[in-house]
């Protein structure tokens, strides 16, 4: 009695529904791939890329550009290799004094620190020994030394760069000093109180030492300038590094301060002569 519907209405062919859904999925996936391929880079990315390109170009320019060679600073040995050593002159000392004090003193004070050429004895021409040089600049040494009776003062003061050099100069002066008394004036292993006591108790004719200790003795009234007739600087001698005493910053500073402690004033007054050995 019922109509024959053939296949049941709920039974559909297996391939219909299943085939339609995958087709849609494939279509969507292809569209998404296309979108990915056509994706336009953002503004930030473009700026970043431009910066990277610019940096790389600048780096290439720097690599290709010739590098500037740094000038090698000349050493003392380089200068001596090109030019023979020259003896120090009064002008050398005058120039150093002016350069050291020009920004620290008034115009009037600088005038008082000027050392006229008349304050100097003949400088060493690099042919002398210490004894022969002293004999030349102190022709009346024998008479001066015999008449010297004052304590706390010396007739001749020799200024050098170090304690070791002081000991060398004491040996070199033997041919000149005769029977006169020599005292070493440096700080190494010797207390300043002991040096002051020795100067107070004994008559000393020659003092040899470093500028720092000599100035300290003058400042503490251990060494008087009243009897001093000659002030000699070990100007031309060079150490193992080929430095003269005024090439060593600390020694240079102490030497110029020593000159300012009354020695320039004494030389300008005519009681003291300066020599550059």
Swiss-Prot record:
<dbReference type="InterPro" id="IPR027417">
    <property type="entry name" value="P-loop_NTPase"/>
</dbReference>
<dbReference type="InterPro" id="IPR032704">
    <property type="entry name" value="Cms1"/>
</dbReference>
<feature type="region of interest" description="Disordered">
    <location>
        <begin position="1"/>
        <end position="91"/>
    </location>
</feature>
<protein>
    <recommendedName>
        <fullName>Protein CMSS1</fullName>
    </recommendedName>
</protein>
<feature type="compositionally biased region" description="Basic and acidic residues">
    <location>
        <begin position="24"/>
        <end position="34"/>
    </location>
</feature>
<feature type="compositionally biased region" description="Basic residues">
    <location>
        <begin position="35"/>
        <end position="52"/>
    </location>
</feature>
<dbReference type="GO" id="GO:0005634">
    <property type="term" value="C:nucleus"/>
</dbReference>
<feature type="compositionally biased region" description="Acidic residues">
    <location>
        <begin position="1"/>
        <end position="14"/>
    </location>
</feature>
<dbReference type="Pfam" id="PF14617">
    <property type="entry name" value="CMS1"/>
</dbReference>
<feature type="compositionally biased region" description="Basic and acidic residues">
    <location>
        <begin position="53"/>
        <end position="66"/>
    </location>
</feature>
<comment type="similarity">
    <text>Belongs to the CMS1 family.</text>
</comment>
<dbReference type="GO" id="GO:0030686">
    <property type="term" value="C:90S preribosome"/>
</dbReference>
